[in-house]
């Protein structure tokens, strides 16, 4: 745990060094002032008892000044804590996102990776780094307070020091046990929390709400949500009951210790071992010691809990990343050569892609077709390096895709997927965000809008219209959003573009119309279209037919019809959708 504590403090110092230094200064000042104030009270009361009013007033002013100084230091301390929480939370959230971007796409198919990500996000959202640093500072501050007040108590009476120590030890034991229990509970509940959040967000997703109402399944989803919530709440309530009972017992023992200290102090006074000022100061010191020791032991016992939550963040940050290539991508390749590749998803025992070999020439237009589950999307992810082959190789010219430096490679690749993003931004941003350095290339944006048959948006004024209903912008039809997604892919100056069923939600005729526009625009690019419909297949140079993870046929439209194989069967089933 020591390495974890140093690592977390190092990150806090890296992000907010000035605030951290101010916290240390304020913490030390507060801690020392407690002991100084206790001693001053003893001196002040003795002067009052001896009726030395002039000196008493001076000491009273000093005591008041110490109280004010302590409060100012406390306010500055927590102001710095708020600043640290804000800066550290934002910076670590960004670094968490950057780490997620460096993981391979296939790693997100692993449930454990997703659970780690959820716990890491919770660590940031709930301010666990601030909790940990606060616990560390509390421990250091209370050590100074405990040491200084214990020194004063021991000067008054060693017995008072011993009683004060024994009265606060139960806090440490309870906090240590309950802290570990609470972390294990939250770790156990992480999967349930993901499920609960998913069900909850269904009611806020306007794409889902319509279906919930039409099918009348709101009550069913609500029941599942309440069931998940109630199970988690019951587990949490059971823990809280144990926690409350344990701390109530600790409070009782602490109060018993304080009463015992009063009795001991009175006996010492009666035996002339304490004077009046020392009596009051010893009781004040005992109370301060109990409070400081209590918070010290609570913070110390809570430290493993806080550290465990922070460890969740580093558990995700420390996930091994794929070794990235360093080879510069040569966009002048003559063809893409796929040699005997196979691939399976994590935690499965079947091949999603099985022993596929094929060639794709540069600037060739390709349609990959097949029924759902045939492996089309998986093949495209392998061709674009989003997944790595487990067997075989993919060559761009003579270069192996696994050796490419990713940033350089992806500058030359555009992908428009079925679950394309609807950016709640301006029309200009929706298109040019794929190559944002050319955001102000108005002529290119307008030309793409015309080519995608969206002339109503091609004026300069329309480019700055906010789209989407989230921020009171203009809502578009699904067809318009899909055309913008394709335009976004085309705006990027890439040598290869892939459409992975982005028009699947459209009717076959509209889909074919949009894809014909796409092929016309992309005639000087390597264009790959993935679809389970065959309407566009007449327009492409080559058709790849897939079934059960294998390529079963390759050829053009007429060649494959003549074979009367898998493509022929698909064509016969779908030909009624298209106008000949």
Question: For each of these PLM feature ranges, what is it?
Answer:
Residues 1-33, 54, 58, 77, ...:
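Membrane-integrated ABC transporters
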Residues 20-76, 150-182, 272-276, 283, ...:
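Transmembrane helix-loop-helix hairpins at lipid-water interfaces of multipass membrane proteins
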Residues 95-127, 189-224, 315-326, 346, ...:
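Short intracellular "coupling" helices and adjacent cytoplasmic loop segments at the cytosolic face
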């Amino acid at each position: 745990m020591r390495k974890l504590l140093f690592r977390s403090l190092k990150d806090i110092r890296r992000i907010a060094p000035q605030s951290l230094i101010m916290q240390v200064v304020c913490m030390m000042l507060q801690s020392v002032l407690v002991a100084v104030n206790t001693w001053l009270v003893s001196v002040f009361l003795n002067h009052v008892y001896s009726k030395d009013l002039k000196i008493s007033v001076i000491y009273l002013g000093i005591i008041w000044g110490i109280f004010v100084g302590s409060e100012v230091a406390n306010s500055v301390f927590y102001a710095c804590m708020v600043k640290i929480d804000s800066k550290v939370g934002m910076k670590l959230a960004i670094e968490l996102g950057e780490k997620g971007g460096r993981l391979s796409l296939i790693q997100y198919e692993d449930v454990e990776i997703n659970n780690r990500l959820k716990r890491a996000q919770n660590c940031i959202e709930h301010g666990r780094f601030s909790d940990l640093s606060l616990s560390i500072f509390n421990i250091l501050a209370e050590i100074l307070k405990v040491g200084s007040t214990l020194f004063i108590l021991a000067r008054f009476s060693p017995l008072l020091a011993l009683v004060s120590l024994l009265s606060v030890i139960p806090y440490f034991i309870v906090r240590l046990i309950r802290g570990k229990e609470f972390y294990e509970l939250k770790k156990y509940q992480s999967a349930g929390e993901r499920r609960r959040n998913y069900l909850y967000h269904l009611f806020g997703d306007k794409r889902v709400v319509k279906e919930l109402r039409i099918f009348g399944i709101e009550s069913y989803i609500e029941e599942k949500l309440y069931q998940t919530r109630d199970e988690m709440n019951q587990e949490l309530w059971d823990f809280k009951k144990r926690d409350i009972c344990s701390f109530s017992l600790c409070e009782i023992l602490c109060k018993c210790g304080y009463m015992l200290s009063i009795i001991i102090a009175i006996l010492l006074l009666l035996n002339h071992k304490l004077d009046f000022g020392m009596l009051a100061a010893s009781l004040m010191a005992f109370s301060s010691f109990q409070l400081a020791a209590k918070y010290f032991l609570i913070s110390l016992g809570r430290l493993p809990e806080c550290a465990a939550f922070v460890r969740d963040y580093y558990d995700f940050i420390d996930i091994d990343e794929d070794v990235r290539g360093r080879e510069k991508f040569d966009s002048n390749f003559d063809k893409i050569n796929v040699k005997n590749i196979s691939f399976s998803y994590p935690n499965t025992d079947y091949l999603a892609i099985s022993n596929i070999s094929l060639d794709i020439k540069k600037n060739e237009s390709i349609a990959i077709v097949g029924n759902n589950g045939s492996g089309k999307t998986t093949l495209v992810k392998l061709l674009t390096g989003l997944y790595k082959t487990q067997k075989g190789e993919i060559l761009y010219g003579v270069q192996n895709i696994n050796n490419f430096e990713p940033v350089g490679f992806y500058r030359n690749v555009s992908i428009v997927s079925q679950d394309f993003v609807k950016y709640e931004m301006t029309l200009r941003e929706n298109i040019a965000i794929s190559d944002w350095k050319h955001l102000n290339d108005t002529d290119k944006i307008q030309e793409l809008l015309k080519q995608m048959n969206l002339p109503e948006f091609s004026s300069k004024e329309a480019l700055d219209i906010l789209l989407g209903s989230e921020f009171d912008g203009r809502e578009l039809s699904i067809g318009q959003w899909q055309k913008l997604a394709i335009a976004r892919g085309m705006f990027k100056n890439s040598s290869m573009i892939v459409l992975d069923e982005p028009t699947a939600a459209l009717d076959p005729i509209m889909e074919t119309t949009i894809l014909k526009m796409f092929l016309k625009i992309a005639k000087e690019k390597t264009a790959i279209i993935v679809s389970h419909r065959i309407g566009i297949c007449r327009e492409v140079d080559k058709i790849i037919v897939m079934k059960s993870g294998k390529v079963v046929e390759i050829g053009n439209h007429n060649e494959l019809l003549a074979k009367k194989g898998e493509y022929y069967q698909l064509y016969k089933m779908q030909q009624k959708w298209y106008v000949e």
